[in-house]
Amino acid sequence: MDTTEKLKLINRNLKEVIGGDIMEKIINKRDLNVYWGTATTGKPHIAYFLPILKIKDFVDAGCNVTILLADIHAFLDNLKAPIEKIECRSQYYKKIITLMLKSIKVDVSKISFIFGSEYQKSNKYFTDILRILNQTKKNDARRAGSEVVKQVKNSKLSSLVYPAMQALDEEYLNVDVQFGGIDQRKIFMYAREFLPLLKYKKRIHLMNPMIPGLNSDKMSSSDIDSKIDLLDTKLEIYKKIHNCSLENEGLIFLFKSIIYPYCSIFNLQIMISGKVYTFDKLYEDIKMKIIDETELKNIASDMIERLICPIRDEMLRDLKLIENAYGNK
């Protein structure tokens, strides 16, 4: 695969790329080092397949990929993860993300997992936290985290440290690229502004679109009705899909960003009323309201069940891990 082909795969379906000119120069010399971080808070849901599918593109393009399980970040974000649950939730995340990667034919031997607590407690990292915070005004930190960190009227100081740590992670993971959702953009711009003040280089930033919820603007772990949990039963998936409205495009986005890419990997087709549908034709017929909505939702339910069934079955073999991480909910 030449540089042009690699760049096409790396940039495919992204919402925004910052620093693409630098990326091409690096790829001409060596493999790109990319990291994606996720705070180990609520249970991963179907929308997590959006970054997982993108990680497959990175691996297929020859990138070295690191997945940061941001356990300390999870605690800092308004106590989304109680400190006594952090280790169990981090192990839960590692296991389920590994299963997700395997389910779409990613060679997990090409991916490195690291917990934030493995290096974020070091003296050097702590010194750099003090250095970057010494350059950061309160409003800088609040603005940077406004789309990611839970916003409350009287923010805890810990939530203001969150963006600074995420910026420093780029340096301490020794990467060229940080990848995340478009909701991370303000943190990425903070990193580009403040890392050079510590004599660290700016990184490249790649951003995915966000998946809307089934009946809301954003699919969220905290909103049960907006998401499909990766441990949901076949019946729960069916009910959630059939209760969602086509008006807010949550289901349409699932087809575009998860179901069709999954079908492409396994050479599957979407067939409705005896007709094979591309996504563009599907979207057109939905907008024109000439598609059988019940059959459409049946197909969506079946494909999502097919995708998550092996993941759910494997996770349910370790009920102790689930209980320790999230209780009985």
Curated annotation (Swiss-Prot):
Pfam families: tRNA-synt_1b. A motif ('HIGH' region) lies at residues 40-48. One of its GO terms (molecular function) is ATP binding. One of its GO terms (biological process) is tyrosyl-tRNA aminoacylation. Keywords: Aminoacyl-tRNA synthetase, ATP-binding, Cytoplasm, Ligase, Nucleotide-binding, Protein biosynthesis. It comes from the Eukaryota. GO terms for cellular component: cytoplasm. It is found in: Cytoplasm. It catalyses: tRNA(Tyr) + L-tyrosine + ATP = L-tyrosyl-tRNA(Tyr) + AMP + diphosphate + H(+). InterPro entries: aa-tRNA-synth_Ic, Rossmann-like_a/b/a_fold, Tyr-tRNA-ligase, Tyr-tRNA-ligase_arc/euk-type, Tyr-tRNA_synthase. L-tyrosine binds at residues 35, 162, 166, 169, 184. Disulfide bonds: none annotated. Homodimer. Belongs to the class-I aminoacyl-tRNA synthetase family. This is Probable tyrosine--tRNA ligase, cytoplasmic.
